[in-house]
């Protein structure tokens, strides 16, 4: 069983969000939540929320399909960060010049799954 959660237009640069996502890729869901809870990076908060949402989505899918479900079995099968739209702003500088400020956004996707068979556990 797979469950997915996506957060779009998150106001964190994709490069910084990828650093955090790389920490949790392939780990158990509860272990990844613990890592994100204590990670010092600011991007860990939106990634934490997306992972929580994916786990909740898995719980809803299991209830809907009447499948036996244990949150301890969930692992992160996919996690990636795509670049969202960039807001462009100008910073006034001396002598009529202006510097461009690029406020980047991210789309964060996390997919959690249960192992397909007993050998995968």
UniProtKB/Swiss-Prot annotation:
The keyword Signal does not apply. It comes from the Bacteria. Coiled coil: none annotated. Keywords: Ribonucleoprotein, Ribosomal protein, RNA-binding, rRNA-binding. GO terms for molecular function: rRNA binding; structural constituent of ribosome. GO terms for cellular component: cytosolic large ribosomal subunit. GO terms for biological process: translation. InterPro entries: Ribosomal_uL22, Ribosomal_uL22_bac/chlpt-type, Ribosomal_uL22_bac/org-type, Ribosomal_uL22_CS, Ribosomal_uL22_sf. It holds the Pfam family Ribosomal_L22. The keyword Zinc does not apply. NCBIfam families: rplV_bact. This protein binds specifically to 23S rRNA; its binding is stimulated by other ribosomal proteins, e.g. L4, L17, and L20. It is important during the early stages of 50S assembly. It makes multiple contacts with different domains of the 23S rRNA in the assembled 50S subunit and ribosome. Belongs to the universal ribosomal protein uL22 family. Part of the 50S ribosomal subunit. This is Large ribosomal subunit protein uL22.
